[in-house]
Amino acid sequence: MESKNITCENSIEKRLVTEVERVGGWCLKLPAIHNAGLPDRICLFPGGRILFVELKAPGKKPREIQLFMHRKIRALGFRVEVVDTPEQIKKIIKEYEEQCKFSSGKN
């Protein structure tokens, strides 16, 4: 079962990277070797937008240390999302694209 969850999470991660790159962003993998609980990815979008993403297999929840780190990052004013479905990725990208239209006056 654990192997299937890892495969699902990897599939979601690949989709995230593809979609962020499609809109001109960069999706960096954060090594947690010395920083337990850090989100899996930091997404850098054109226009200076930054998003931290915790990737999970469908239905899985973040561990307590991850939730603690999410709170710390949010307290600094950054956005943190927990993603376990492709639909959530679509929603994040759509929100980013809408913000870009609004800020550039293209609406």
Per-range role (PLM):
Residues 1-107:
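Catalytic phosphate/metal-binding cores of nucleic-acid and nucleotide-processing enzymes, i.e., regions
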